[in-house]
Amino acid sequence: MPNRTLLIAGNWKMNNDVAEAAKLADELAQALPEVPAGVEVLVCPPTIDITTVHDRIQAAPIALGAQNVYWEAKGAFTGESSCDMLKSAGCTYCIIGHSERR
């Protein structure tokens, strides 16, 4: 059987303002100073909170993702975020095709 990484992911939907997101990210980072080998922890906050959460989980073993991504690289797509934009904000994952977005 191939070695697989267990991915534990979560998001808080459209909840928490920036201050609440910062507090939650701080709590997550303190609660997870390390994770076992073969496990990856991922958090996907709302887009407006990505940079705040990124700054607070940088030193923790927590990956950052987005709740949605738009397929075009650039353009007049109000309210959307491209892969490059999310990557530049520190995201390494993204939820794609969630039933709430279809």
List the model feature ranges, each with a label.
Residues 1-102:
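Active-site loop-to-helix "anion-binding N-cap" substructures in soluble metabolic enzymes
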